[in-house]
Amino acid sequence: MPGDDKGMAGARRAFLAQDYYAPLRRALCELSVSLTGDHPRVLDSGCGEGYYTAGIYHALVNAGKAPQMAGIDISKSILRLAAKRPEPIEYAVASSYHLPVADGSIDLLINCFSPLAREEFQRVLVPGGHFLYVVPSARHLWEMKEVLYDHPYPNEVKETPYEGFRYVTIRHVEAVIHLQTQQDIHALFQMTPYYWKTPKDGAARLSALDTLDTTISFDIHAYERI
């Protein structure tokens, strides 16, 4: 099955429900409100279990807007969790490269840690519409990486132009979180690409920890559809 399996999906939801990533969600909410009109049509591409999707919905409603929102993901397991949320958001199993929406039908597209399908995003966004592209910044999870690897290196940070889009701004989000249990540490580890490529000795060092303070660091790139 593509995407997260049932166990990983549940761990992800339990982790995010504790609001460790609340600073990122708050920044996404603020940008979503500032970049949309009164009746925005919003698509979260790679929405996962809907943590950011639901937060953005409530932010738009609280700002007096009437959003129409949808989310897509390739994982059936994680979308089942998203569909249990109470917000009136439509969810569908789909790829970012084959979005099940009409041409020029979206005002704001959210893309958190998912593949950037430039041509498909350009197709579905209205001219003047925006997409928010979230990527890990240089020191994201630095302290966790120090446990996992002998010689960790920072993530590459760059502002990339894309054909058909105007680069609007970058919003940097950074905080230090305190992971209170080994369960939380492992859940976060599962959410990262490091889970699949870390040597066994590094993973063993991480599994021996009961708590961990680590930096979370993100860049939100905002683009406008030309």
Set out the residue ranges of the language-model regions:
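Conserved beta-strand signature within the Rossmann-like core of class I S-adenosyl-L-methionine
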Residues: 128-138
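A short acidic, Gly/Pro-enriched loop at the edge of an enzyme's catalytic core
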Residues: 97-108
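Conserved class I S-adenosyl-L-methionine
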Residues: 39-48
